[in-house]
């Protein structure tokens, strides 16, 4: 595999020209694919069912991928027209950002997506990454060490020269409200806005593996993975729903005077409910987290049976939890020793749950209802806090 770093000096002298020449093309691309109102319907077979934000339609010689704006459901965030190299140049393509597939040279901003691409068997097509320190995929780490995978720096301000040298077929990024991609947008490289993290249900998010499957020419593999995930998730949720008791569950803790709790339409609320738990804020309309002070949380959830905390090392103890805020010790789960922590510095929790929510669901069922419902007595991510 070539080492693109060797060409950095060559590109410096012509980068300004590249940006100038590509600006017009980038503008045309963005106008045709992004920020429009509700998209015109296209005829074909719909490939998605659970996702609220992603719609894939197979139109025969190409696939249309519509991504709804998570912050304004009346508008389209992006429309991509995925055209296989084997299809040549089909006539009558709908408006949208054209992406030739399969991707063979991609720049990926998130380790979560790299993990899913690995599962599809296409990890060799990941030739560049941003925020390299957060990637745990072994093949990517080895590539970074050997130089086969380029580190382009921070996803918030990637090294434009390195990106130009890499010349990826596409960039996979996570969009944020009212944000832009800076100079990267002027290179004319398709930016695939992976808004999967904004989905409100676990299976809705997991279904985004189908988009990756289309991008990397792995539809069969993506369909197979999603089918297995969906079946296992549904089986576990059905078993949990049959439980006679449902514990009240709180998540995270007070940090800098703010406690983030899951809104009623959030991903976390969905998976807590599916695992047989009760989210105290399940009746709220919020699709994300709600910011509260300690008094508000305590008033509604002081009698919580289970307390789940994600913590990036070092190991957290009950005494440390109490010393960080004394009234933590008056929460029922604390008093009964039912506080569980996932150390995200060592576990693969963040890498696993987006595309394999059945793993997290099984763990929650074990913690909420016990091994008879979970089918296992071993945890993978969470451990009970010691004194």
PLM regions with names:
Residues 2-18:
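Bacterial N-terminal signal peptides that target proteins for export
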Residues 14-30:
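Bacterial N-terminal signal peptides
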Residues 31-114, 221-250, 335, 348, ...:
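Bacterial Sec-exported substrate-binding components of ABC uptake systems
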Residues 66, 71-164, 170-173:
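A short, structured surface patch at a secondary-structure boundary
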Residues 96, 101-105, 116, 148-154, ...:
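Second-shell loop/turn segments in exported
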Residues 104, 112-113, 129-139, 179, ...:
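Extracytoplasmic ligand-binding site segments that recognize negatively charged/polar headgroups
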Residues 199, 203-228, 309-387:
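Structured C-terminal subdomain patch of bacterial secreted/periplasmic proteins
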Residues 231, 236-322:
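Flexible, glycine-rich surface segments
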